[in-house]
């Protein structure tokens, strides 16, 4: 909801997920997409980048470069092909992939990142491609993310409550051991932080 508010409930969003296998990443991506579909008809997901699918994406980006349907920025990149030289998929870095997504989707207005690594990856890509008009929200709050928030490179972060998560887990385990049953969902809370409430 916070990203939708920042984007005036319209526009395209890029999702960066830290992986395609963990329950946390799957649920965050699915929940984000479901909320957009349910509440924000003028918003859509431009693409989802799963950071553990790098080999497949390296092949795709290299193929597009080699067929001429995509060109990387030439700013200081000596690895760009010249003439008939072909780019190997292994020449494509994660930075190249992020830049590819940002350049292939120039109309993206927002980005949702599923953890600290994803937040830092997209902000780094936006710095390289000089995109300063894309709203970024994500999870976690390590020192680097807080610095990005202070500088206005990140618009908001969902900060989980690790103490409550651990406490609730111990209580649930004890209740289970005593055959007392547990709630199907336990809300351990979170805090939404922005530059204004740090």
Regions found by a protein language model. Give the residues of each.
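A residue-level marker of the well-folded mature domains of exported/periplasmic proteins
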Residues: 1-198
């Amino acid at each position: 909801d916070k990203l939708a508010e920042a984007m005036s409930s319209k526009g395209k969003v890029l999702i960066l997920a830290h992986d395609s296998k963990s329950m946390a990443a799957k649920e965050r991506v699915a929940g984000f997409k479901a909320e957009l579909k349910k509440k924000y008809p003028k918003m859509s997901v431009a693409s989802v980048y799963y950071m553990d699918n790098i080999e497949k994406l390296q092949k795709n980006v290299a193929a597009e470069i080699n067929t001429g349907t995509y060109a990387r920025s030439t700013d200081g990149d000596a690895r760009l092909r010249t003439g008939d030289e072909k780019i190997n998929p292994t020449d494509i870095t994660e930075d190249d992939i992020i830049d590819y997504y940002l350049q292939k989707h120039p109309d993206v207005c927002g980005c949702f990142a599923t953890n600290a690594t994803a937040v830092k990856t997209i902000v780094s890509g936006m710095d390289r491609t000089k995109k300063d008009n894309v709203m970024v929200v994500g999870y976690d709050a390590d020192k680097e993310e807080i610095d990005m928030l202070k500088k206005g490179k990140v618009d908001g972060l969902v900060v989980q409550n690790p103490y409550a998560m651990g406490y609730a887990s111990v209580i649930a385990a004890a209740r289970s051991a005593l055959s007392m049953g547990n709630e199907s969902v336990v809300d351990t809370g979170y805090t939404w932080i922005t530059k204004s409430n740090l």
